[in-house]
Amino acid sequence: GGGCSPGMRRFFDPRHYRAVLFDQRGCGRSTPNASVENNTTWDLVADIERIREALGIERWIVFGGSWGACLALLYAQAHPERVTRLVLRGVFTMTRAELDWFYGGGAGAFWPEQWQAFSQMVPAEERHDLIAAYHRRLFGADAAERVRFARAWAGWESALAVLDPGESRGSPASGYALAFARLENH
């Protein structure tokens, strides 16, 4: 949900690879920002194929991390004749077990302070389903509440992206957090 950053180029040696980085619908520089309209997994897979066609690439190596790894797998299944290799890192396939671990407290055992900050945003009677509780607020009518919950969601995700629980990436900017959280929660 965060879009591409210049640091993502570090995975590719430009002397050997033509790297194509793109922001999926609603993320990064993609417009409309933070939109979930016409933004299904299969819309994203179709977008990848349109990018390949537009660039005139016959076959390519497909690389993806986290949610991008899931999209890469689905793209390779839909278009096996276009994929020479898959390179996947930090694979997240959005299974019930993965979602329960990330948003049901499992990961919180490793990052207890960050988990408390994330989960305590929601009233106790709604904590049995944090994804749904956050969804109501991320897509609700109150703009200030949307931003507050988006920053909490992005902060939790950021905590999970580092090896040292004491390491902090700081508080994400509101616009980034809103797009990131809405797309991930969607």
Label every model-predicted segment.
Residues 69-80, 86:
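Short glycine-enriched nucleophile-adjacent loop
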Residues 1-13:
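The serine-hydrolase catalytic nucleophile loop
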Residues 1-2, 24-28, 68, 92-93:
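Alpha/beta-hydrolase active-site loop signature
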Residues 81-134, 186:
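A catalytic-pocket lid/entrance helix-loop region that shapes and gates access to the active site
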Residues 12-32:
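Conserved alpha/beta-hydrolase
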Residues 150-186:
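Alpha/beta-hydrolase fold catalytic core
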Residues 60, 64-69:
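Conserved alpha/beta-hydrolase "nucleophile elbow" surrounding the catalytic nucleophile
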